[in-house]
Amino acid sequence: MMAYIGFILSIMFVISFVGFSSKPSPIYGGLVLIMSGGFGCGIVMSFGGSFLGLMVFLIYLGGMLVVFGYTTAMATEQYPEVWVSSAAVLGAFVLGVLMEVVLVLYVYKNGEVEVVFNFSGVGDWAVSDNGGFGVFSEEIVGVSALYSYGVWIIIVTGWSLFVGVLVILEITRGA
C-alpha cells in the first residue's frame, strides 16, 4: 500500500511541476508550487522521514509563501491566464504530462532506469542497518551529515533563495 501511495505522490509531484512550468498566471503558479511542496513532503514522509518532511514543509511554506503572496499581489491581472485559456499553455501542460506517462511506461516495461552518475566515496553518507534498534535515528544522521559535509550546499541554497527574491522583486517593480 505504501508503494502505491509513494507512486501516486511522485506522479502528482511531477505533474504539479509540469503545471508550473507551463507558465500560467502567477496566482496559479504559486498555488501549484505550494501543492508540489506538499506532495514532495508527502514523499519524504512516506519513506519514513517524518522530521525532515515536516521541516521542509514548514520552511518551504513559511519562507516562500511570503514571496508568493507578495509577487501575486504585485502581478495581479484582471483576467489571469489559466491552463486552458490559450492553446500554447494547454499544449505545454499536455505535452509534459504525456512525457511523464511515457517515462512511467518505459520504467514499467524495463523494470528499472540506470543511474546517470556514478556515486563513489559516499561511505560517510551511508547508514548501516544492523536489524535492531539503535541509539541514532536515520534522519538525524542525515541532518548531521547535511550540516557537516554539506555546508556548501546550505550556503548555495540560501544564496540562491536570496538572489531569487531579489530577481522577483526586480521583475515585479516595473509592473
UniProtKB/Swiss-Prot annotation:
GO cellular component, one term: mitochondrial inner membrane
Listed EC numbers: 7.1.1.2
Transmembrane feature ranges: 1-21, 25-45, 47-67, 87-107, 116-136, 149-169
Compartments (UniProt record): Mitochondrion inner membrane
Keyword check for Nuclease: no
An example molecular function term from Gene Ontology annotations: NADH dehydrogenase (ubiquinone) activity
Annotated keywords: Electron transport, Membrane, Mitochondrion, Mitochondrion inner membrane, NAD, Respiratory chain, Translocase, Transmembrane, Transmembrane helix, Transport, Ubiquinone
Catalytic activity field: a ubiquinone + NADH + 5 H(+)(in) = a ubiquinol + NAD(+) + 4 H(+)(out)
A GO BP entry: mitochondrial respiratory chain complex I assembly
Known role: Core subunit of the mitochondrial membrane respiratory chain NADH dehydrogenase (Complex I) which catalyzes electron transfer from NADH through the respiratory chain, using ubiquinone as an electron acceptor. Essential for the catalytic activity and assembly of complex I.
Family: Belongs to the complex I subunit 6 family.
Subunit (UniProt): Core subunit of respiratory chain NADH dehydrogenase (Complex I) which is composed of 45 different subunits.
Name under which the protein is recorded: NADH-ubiquinone oxidoreductase chain 6
Organism: Ceratotherium simum
Gene behind this protein: MT-ND6
